[in-house]
């Protein structure tokens, strides 16, 4: 017999399958020995009141073993003789495009400018240890994309529930914990995601596809208005329709398209800082108790949003129990991001705190700077990103040390003469962010912080530190494509894909878009 139950239970009752069996026994009157397996279908924490509960949907197998897997397996066929399709970029958009191509009988040829996920880790370590940024192998470029070493967060606002479930199932098939199928905010963790990515690559190769690292697309091969392949830095050309999944930091790709008058447009972004608190403080605030999360609750998260001066101010990519990391993709820039290991066990909580930026804001943002491009250029907000990242580098001492300021000092426009301990390993340098960042951003952040401090008592504190700058929240450019065919609006055979093309925001939505682009190629 199988029973499904929707329950509201205490955190200590939700910690293990054995404790859940006790709950099922209590609710059904069936003795624990007869309850063979309990699966968690959905799980979320309700911390709105002083007594905290866990909402769970359970499937209990009574007097029988499950005869169904916890997740649906996708069957991948041999495509050695299939039509080749070039996939540029091995982030979630590109990798899931490749897997879907295999399902559809097409042969993916994946080219990635960076290194494989293990080799890439060494270059990322050098950023913190020696302040050296490899322009082709860093937090943005390399197998797995920007998400591989910056959290592995799978939460999405996508309404395409079937598509989301498919992506999560595929992650489980390649080694992710099945907990991502149940959790309200699923998270693989930076420590676990690399192995999952390797497993996906091995599957692509097993099926007859190809994966080429340290192979950068330098040009599209265009014949009679149709993209038929790519030229690369290795001198080798790869032929076939092209899925362009290069990520939001591939600025050379945007410049290449713009220089050749291939239609793109400016897209809104958000910029700001990484805000870091002691995790214990966030636990106390969010769980409404002095002892924090105790033994049975996870590191607490938060989410804030406000409207200030006609623009959104909000938290972004919140990382409980995480670390702030250097995310520059070339020299002369400092960019920060956040990550969490699977256990979310560090002493710090961090989140992007960002202000919405629209293309029409460019002139105001750059009023004290020399404009690198015209205000009407599709590259305008990219130019703003670049200038702000360079300013951050200059104010951080022209290395990967990040300029930083205590939170209350920033709100009061005061210099911070010392800084709290931080997870950011290249180091912090006290700096007046309120002075050198654009007032368009800092003024809205100040008002946003005051509002967040009112709705969440204790959040606005000098125990928190702001670390500059957070600029890579999304692509500053959209590569225009047809809504039905997923092809570029003027170039047949080119399928702009994922976050870098301006059609996704995060791992899951990029993966969904990769699958849709693969289906577009199949219908081409």
Q: Residue ranges of each PLM-predicted region?
A:
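Residues forming the flavin
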Residues: 1-54, 58-149, 153-524
């Amino acid at each position: 017999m199988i029973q499904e139950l929707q329950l509201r239970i205490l955190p200590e009752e939700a910690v293990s399958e054995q404790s859940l069996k006790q709950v099922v026994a209590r609710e059904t009157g069936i003795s624990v020995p007869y309850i063979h397996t309990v699966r968690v279908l959905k799980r979320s924490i309700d911390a709105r009141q002083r007594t905290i509960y866990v909402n769970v949907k359970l499937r209990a197998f009574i007097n029988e073993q499950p005869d169904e897997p916890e997740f649906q397996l996708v069957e991948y066929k041999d495509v050695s003789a299939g039509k080749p399709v070039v996939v540029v970029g091995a982030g979630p958009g590109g990798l899931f495009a490749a897997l879907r191509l295999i399902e559809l009988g097409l042969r993916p040829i994946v080219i990635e400018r960076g290194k494989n996920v293990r080799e890439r880790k060494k270059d990322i370590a050098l950023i913190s240890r020696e302040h050296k940024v490899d322009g082709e192998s860093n937090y943005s470029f390399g197998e797995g994309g920007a998400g591989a070493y910056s959290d592995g967060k799978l939460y999405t606002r996508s309404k395409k529930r079937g598509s989301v479930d498919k992506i999560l199932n595929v992650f489980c098939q390649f080694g992710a914990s099945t907990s991502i199928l149940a959790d309200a905010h699923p998270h693989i963790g930076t420590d676990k995601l690399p192995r999952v990515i390797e497993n996906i690559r091995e599957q692509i190769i097993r099926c007859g596809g190809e994966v080429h690292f340290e192979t950068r697309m330098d040009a599209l091969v265009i014949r009679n208005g149709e993209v038929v392949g790519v030229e690369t830095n290795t001198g080798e050309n790869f032929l076939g329709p092209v899925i362009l999944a290069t990520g939001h930091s591939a600025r050379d790709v945007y410049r290449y398209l713009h220089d050749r008058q291939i239609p793109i447009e400016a897209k809104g972004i958000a910029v700001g800082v990484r805000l870091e608190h002691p995790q214990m403080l966030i636990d106390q605030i969010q769980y409404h108790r002095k002892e924090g999360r105790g033994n049975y609750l996870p590191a607490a998260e938060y989410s804030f949003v406000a409207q200030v001066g006609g623009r959104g101010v909000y938290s972004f990519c919140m990382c409980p129990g995480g670390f702030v990391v250097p995310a520059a993709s070339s020299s002369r820039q400092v960019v920060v991001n956040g990550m969490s290991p699977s256990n979310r066990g560090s002493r710090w909580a961090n989140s992007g705190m960002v202000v919405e930026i629209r293309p029409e804001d460019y002139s105001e943002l750059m009023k004290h700077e020399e404009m690198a491009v015209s205000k009407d250029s599709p590259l305008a907000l990219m130019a703003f990103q670049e200038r702000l990242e360079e300013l951050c580098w200059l104010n951080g001492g022209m290395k990967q040390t990040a300029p930083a300021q205590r939170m209350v000092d920033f709100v009061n426009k005061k210099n911070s003469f010392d800084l709290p301990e931080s997870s950011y390993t290249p180091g912090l340098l006290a700096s007046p962010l309120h002075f050198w960042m654009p007032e368009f951003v800092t003024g809205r952040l100040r008002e946003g912080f005051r509002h967040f401090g009112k709705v969440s008592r204790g959040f606005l504190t000098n125990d928190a530190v702001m670390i500059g700058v957070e600029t890579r929240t999304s692509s500053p450019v959209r590569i225009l494509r047809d809504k039905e065919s997923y092809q570029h609006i003027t170039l047949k055979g080119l399928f702009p894909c994922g976050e870098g093309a301006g059609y996704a925001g995060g791992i899951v939505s990029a993966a969904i878009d990769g699958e849709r682009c693969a289906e577009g190629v199949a219908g081409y």
